Amino acid sequence: MVRHPEYQYLDLMAHLLENGDRRIDRTGVGTLSGLGAMMRFDLSKGQLPVFTTKRVYWKLAVKEMLWFLTGDTNIRNLLKQNVRIWTDWPLAAYRKATGEAISQEDFEARILADEAFAETWGDLGPVYGKQWRQWRDADGQVHDQIATVIDQLRHNPSSRRMIFHAWNVGELAGMALPPCHMVYQFHVSNLPSPGETKRPRLSLMVYQRSCDLFLGNPFNICQQAVLLAMVAQQVDMDVGELVWAGGDVHIYLNHLDAIREQLSREPRPFPTLRLLRRPDSIDDYRIEDFEVSDYEPHAAIAAEVAV
């Protein structure tokens, strides 16, 4: 019997519980960490790797990916969609700069109500979307990495250079949080020879330099699989495999009880993903375009984000 692919994730957390290197990290919370991990997910039959041993709010993950693809770096448009996963960083910066003990709810309300306030305090700096869609080189030329990769997939699918990344050394200091999922590389297999009609198969490998396994990784895996499905649709290819590689993989010390609870649960079948329409470009997808069926996870497990 084939082992459920979610065990790759569960086994990694169990390994860190037993063998992780205990350290005090940037956040002050403390972690059990290790270096180097890999997970592989075969998506060729329409599966979406949304983990099932706790509920993952997949729509939030997809909305974040769609936001990245717009090139936006301000949390205002996320908040308009009821996505609050980036609020902690600008909120912490505002409290530190002003000394005001504002609540998250009041801060978000001001971001939504006051465009000038949002422009000053809601921007995250040149984070993912800026680098993916508007990377500025030393000569001042702006590069749309996503558009370039899609063009390569259409016209030179055997290339080994179909990569985009967000680790812009010259702009790291201005980012609210340097990129964790850094490098995305596409690979095309099953390429037809002249005269053949078979469909190519598109796979994606992601390198993530730093990974909060309990809270962050379930979102990352889900949204990266969705990105693969979107790009495959745009370039008329079948979906292949998602390969995820982690650098510093860690679990936070304040998540240990929650992780033990999750490890006590048995994985359930992954749901399926269907794209309900084919937009004209990668820029035109909306959350309504994604249908996830047969997702029946265990209950959610709450935990605090380390900022």
UniProtKB/Swiss-Prot annotation:
Reactions mediated catalytically: dUMP + (6R)-5,10-methylene-5,6,7,8-tetrahydrofolate = 7,8-dihydrofolate + dTMP
**Disulphide-bonded residues:** none
A molecular function annotated in GO for this UniProt entry is: thymidylate synthase activity
Keyword set for this entry? Cytoplasm, Methyltransferase, Nucleotide biosynthesis, Transferase
Q: State which pathway it belongs to.
A: Pyrimidine metabolism; dTTP biosynthesis
Task: Give the EC number(s) under which this enzyme is classified.
Answer: 2.1.1.45
Instruction: Tell me which GO cellular component terms the UniProt record holds.
Output: cytosol
Catalytic residues identified in the record: 180 (nucleophile)
User: Which compartments does it reside in?
Assistant: Cytoplasm
As for family, the record states: Belongs to the thymidylate synthase family. Bacterial-type ThyA subfamily.
State how it assembles: Homodimer.
Task of the protein: Catalyzes the reductive methylation of 2'-deoxyuridine-5'-monophosphate (dUMP) to 2'-deoxythymidine-5'-monophosphate (dTMP) while utilizing 5,10-methylenetetrahydrofolate (mTHF) as the methyl donor and reductant in the reaction, yielding dihydrofolate (DHF) as a by-product. This enzymatic reaction provides an intracellular de novo source of dTMP, an essential precursor for DNA biosynthesis.
Name this polypeptide is given: Thymidylate synthase
Question: What is the species of this protein?
Answer: Rhizobium rhizogenes (strain K84 / ATCC BAA-868) (Agrobacterium radiobacter)
